[in-house]
Design a protein with these regions (language model features):
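Residues that form generic nucleotide/phosphate-binding pockets
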Residues: 125, 129, 147-150, 221
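Short amphipathic alpha-helix that is part of the acyltransferase structural core
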Residues: 1-16, 104-138, 242-243
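Acyl-donor-binding surface of acyltransferase catalytic domains
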Residues: 44-107, 190-243
Length: 243
């Protein structure tokens, strides 16, 4: 028999009156649809996973979310056996010129900074892109201003006529966020961006979420990458809340 004993936001987990660990439920104020779960179980036994997550879903009254490194095989097996689904893989990439396989490009790059008109356009473009590509994982629920507050102050971008078609928010050698209106124009932009940055920096770094086509296209321009990732698992069994 599985029982949970609550202390504030922490739950002690008992199986047949024996403590097998604890877990914590918490919120991310920027992504409020899902309830985040931090598991600290001594024995992630797949025999109790379905019962445990069904009970947590009742308590939270919304989908559950767990973040885990992709090399944590035992924990991942526990999540999958209980009904979680992997919704996102996030790859951390750090590369140099020797890793680049994208070839030459001649997209015309422009630069703007916070406070300029094109910077505001780039912010709105990125916000729409982020909201669309991440809504199936855990939608952004904070306001637009909060989103912009976390962005770097420098943008590299390209235009077709008067329209901005590709954007990269950058900070020194880090490409923090990218987006574009279509894959073809963004691919040309990304190659030019990378070649330009690698002329200035020995390495560049960025994160690529597999739910974000632009970030994954950027990742595809390089070889010799580490394939471990930081993964997002979601449990969204609404039937679990019925009694």
């Amino acid at each position: 028999m599985l029982t949970l004993q609550r202390t504030d936001d922490t739950y002690i987990v008992y199986r047949d009156d024996r403590c097998i660990g604890s877990l914590r439920l918490y919120d991310n104020p920027h992504h409020m649809r899902n309830c985040y779960v931090k598991l600290e179980l001594d024995e992630p036994d797949t025999g109790i996973s379905a019962e445990l997550f069904k009970e947590l879903r009742k308590i939270a009254e919304r989908p559950l979310q767990v973040m885990v490194d992709s090399d944590k095989a035992e924990l991942i097996a526990f999540l999958l056996s209980g009904g979680f689904v992997c919704r996102r893989k996030c790859y951390e990439v750090e590369v140099g010129i020797e890793d680049y396989i994208g070839g030459q490009a001649d997209a015309q790059l422009e630069h703007c900074r916070i406070g300029e008109a094109d910077y505001e356009k780039a912010c709105r473009m990125l916000f729409a892109h982020y909201a669309e590509t991440h809504k199936a994982v855990n939608p952004w629920t904070a306001d637009y201003g909060t989103f912009c507050d976390a962005l770097p102050e420098d943008v590299i971008y390209s235009k077709q006529g008067a329209e901005i078609v590709s954007v990269a928010f950058v900070e020194e050698n880090e490409i923090a966020y990218v987006c574009g209106v279509d894959k073809n124009s963004f691919a040309e932009f990304a190659r030019s961006l990378v070649c330009t940055m690698l002329e200035k920096y020995e390495t560049i770094c960025f994160e690529s979420d597999d739910c974000d086509w632009a970030a994954m296209l950027l990742k595809s321009l390089f070889k010799n990458q580490e394939e471990t990732s930081y993964d997002t698992y979601v449990y969204d069994n609404e039937a679990a809340i019925s009694r």
